[in-house]
Design a protein with these regions (language model features):
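Conserved class I S-adenosyl-L-methionine
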Residues: 2-47, 61-65, 83-86, 142-175
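Class I SAM-dependent methyltransferase SAM/SAH-binding core
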Residues: 53-55, 59-103
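A short SAM/SAH-binding and catalytic strip from SAM-dependent methyltransferases
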Residues: 113-126
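Nucleotide donor/acceptor-binding cores
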Residues: 49-51
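A short glycine-rich, Lys/Arg-flanked "PGG" loop and its adjoining helix->strand segment in the class I
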Residues: 127-142
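A short acidic, Gly/Pro-enriched loop at the edge of an enzyme's catalytic core
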Residues: 102-113
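A short, aliphatic-rich alpha-helical micro-motif
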Residues: 46-47, 108, 130
Length: 175
């Protein structure tokens, strides 16, 4: 069995190598699931929040939405340089940095809300990540996370044969 650090290295390499695939296929209107389901839910849950952290921000589309809703400070973190670079280039007044969910680079009680869209299903150490979220949330803060789940099916849902991974992997895609 591969070591934890070996697994993380392989996983980060996969995300780095395929960042453009994610950006092209799932952001800025390319993915109906984000446009029709996730962004409206995120807007509803995060409206009125002042200081928001977007864990696994990718290109920053949820972060930019939260900023447009009037948040004072929006920070986004992603474990891959390629996503951080694109999020920074797309602007929107965000503070974007490279970090993982298992070691959030923020002081305790820094945020009113933390959001993670389609992220936690990819995190190996969920317990540590949730502990970190709790640490950076202010008392009474809100943690909004969105997960892919086969029970939440929409037209177009089905099994995907992901040929990017070696060996290829099969998973359930919503929408």
């Amino acid at each position: 069995m591969a070591s934890d650090s070996s697994f993380r290295s392989t996983e980060n390499t996969l995300w780095e190598d395929n960042a453009q695939w994610w950006i092209d296929g799932f952001t800025d209107g390319a993915d109906a699931e984000y446009e029709e389901q996730i962004l409206p839910l995120a807007a509803e849950e995060l409206h009125g929040m002042n200081d928001v952290l977007d864990v696994g921000c990718g290109d920053g589309q949820v972060s930019r939405l939260v900023k447009r809703l009037g948040a004072r400070f929006v920070a986004g973190i992603d474990p891959t340089w390629n996503q951080v670079t694109v999020a920074s280039e797309r602007g929107g007044g965000l503070h974007v940095s490279k970090a993982g969910a298992d070691g959030l680079p923020f002081f305790d009680e820094s945020f009113d809300a933390v959001v993670a869209c389609l992220v936690f299903e990819h995190i190996q150490d969920v317990d540590t990540a949730i502990s970190e979220v709790a640490r950076v949330l202010r008392p009474g803060g809100r943690f909004c996370f969105f997960l892919n789940h086969p029970l939440l099916q929409t037209p177009g849902s089905g099994w995907i044969d992901d040929q990017i991974l070696d060996p290829p992997e099969q998973y359930w895609r919503i929408g």
